[in-house]
Amino acid sequence: MGLDIQTEIDKIVIEKVKPEVEYYDVMGGSHRWEVKVHDHGKVALVDTMPRLAPVGQTADFSICQAARVSYGAGTKKVTEDKGLIRYLYRHQHTSPFEMVEFKFHCVMPVFIARQWIRHRTANVNEYSARYSVLPDKFYHPSIEEVRKQSTSNRQGGEEALEPKTAQEFLDYLDKVEENYKTYNELLEKGLSRELGRIGLPVSIYTEWYWKIDLHNLFHFLRLRMDSHSQKEIRDYANTIFALIRPIVPVACEAFIDYAFESLKLTRLEIEAIRTGSPLNTTNKREIEEFEEKKKLLFPNTQA
């Protein structure tokens, strides 16, 4: 940096403005809120923006503050804030929700991390197995949690697998986890960590710091809390929602009402409901999805 620029920067006067109202720490003075997930996993909320909120309000106020700057009005009554937040979410005005951010410390199996990282709208820094030795921790489900392949969802599993085959799977995991001993022995003999790691199973645990804004976090939660997602990542998504809800309760309520527990109808579906006629398509998957929606919309109607 040149001397001239240094001089110009030194001339800048920073005014530390005192707030007009009293503020409090939305995390209650704690440096982290932590929840255990599965056998060795966890999710910890380590920071949030805003960290301070006016007494009597939650971090939801930041959403309204950003929205109202458009027309020059400051923060108003809390009751008005709730209506505004619900309006913004309902009409997909997303940028005010991006003003709230959360930083998490997450520990999860590699196979979950690889699904998780598909959501590319976050900032991530992961444990590096090139620089460090991976810990001897593996995800090992109970026999009741071993699921058979779904007949309707190619990506998922549904009801529990019969005990004999489930036990065979758990025995298979035990054998795979024995690779860790070989991994350690080879590292001690001088094998590079970046190569040694490639023989380890995706059930081994990794960890990262993950920072994301509320708008993109809601998108992540809508997909990963859904019953069609893999149960293991759904457990993490549910935990994240439980951690953020006390901080932005109004926004979370809007998310549940207008996204997570809502239905999206296509033009063909609206026409079929309006006319009482079958769905105008031969696509079997579309028809099945429409039938599921009708069960939710008209639960007392006979098939």
Swiss-Prot record:
Pfam families: Thy1. The gene is thyA. Belongs to the thymidylate synthase ThyX family. Its cofactor is FAD. The active site is at residue 224. Keywords: FAD, Flavoprotein, Methyltransferase, NADP, Nucleotide biosynthesis, Transferase. This is Flavin-dependent thymidylate synthase. Binds 4 FAD per tetramer. Each FAD binding site is formed by three monomers. It comes from Dictyostelium discoideum (Social amoeba).
